[in-house]
């Protein structure tokens, strides 16, 4: 029984947080947005227009992807940059491991 009470209180907390988040978003946007995020009346026509623009951008994005496939040089350049970043991190991690090994060796020598 006490478990059910805990679940109910956590649900209320979640709902409260969602409501607060919506209020903050409305204040930031400077306009009232529907709670469900869907534009259902004329007052929210701006959201409908935004959705149409997003669809157009998505269509344009597909064309850009096709163009990028033809240019192998650009893709290779991007991949090189991405490959360098993780390598640098690995080097730092290896340095830390070396420090630990050094400490272990000193301990073994002392014994």
From Swiss-Prot:
Region listing for Disordered, in residue ranges: 1-111
Compartments, record wording: Nucleus
Residues annotated with N-acetylmethionine modification: 1
Keywords for the protein's UniProt record, in alphabetical order: Acetylation, Isopeptide bond, Nucleus, Phosphoprotein, Ubl conjugation
Modified residues (N6-acetyllysine): 15, 103
In-chain residues carrying the UniProt-annotated modification N6-succinyllysine: 15
Record-linked InterPro entries: Pro/parathymosin (IPR004931)
Annotated positions of the Phosphothreonine modification: 8, 13-14, 102, 107
Bias type Acidic residues, positions: 43-84
Modified residues (N-acetylserine): 2
Chain positions found as Phosphoserine: 2, 9-10
GO CC list: cytosol; nucleoplasm
Predominant subcellular localization, coarse grouping: nucleus
Pfam families: Prothymosin
PTM notes: Covalently linked to a small RNA of about 20 nucleotides.
GO molecular function, one term: DNA-binding transcription factor binding
Assembly notes: Interacts with NUPR1; regulates apoptotic process.
Listed PANTHER family: PROTHYMOSIN ALPHA
UniProt family annotation: Belongs to the pro/parathymosin family.
Stated name of the protein: Prothymosin alpha
């Amino acid at each position: 029984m006490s478990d059910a009470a805990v679940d109910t209180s956590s649900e209320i907390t979640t709902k409260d947080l969602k409501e607060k988040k919506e209020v903050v978003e409305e204040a930031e946007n400077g306009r009232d947005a529907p709670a469900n995020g869907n534009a259902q009346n004329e007052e929210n026509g701006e959201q409908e227009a935004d959705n149409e623009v997003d669809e157009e951008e998505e269509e344009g994005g597909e064309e850009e992807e096709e163009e990028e496939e033809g240019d192998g040089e650009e893709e290779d350049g991007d991949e090189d940059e991405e490959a360098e970043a993780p390598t640098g991190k690995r080097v730092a991690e290896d340095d830390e491991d070396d420090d630990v090994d050094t400490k272990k060796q000193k301990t073994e020598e002392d014994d």
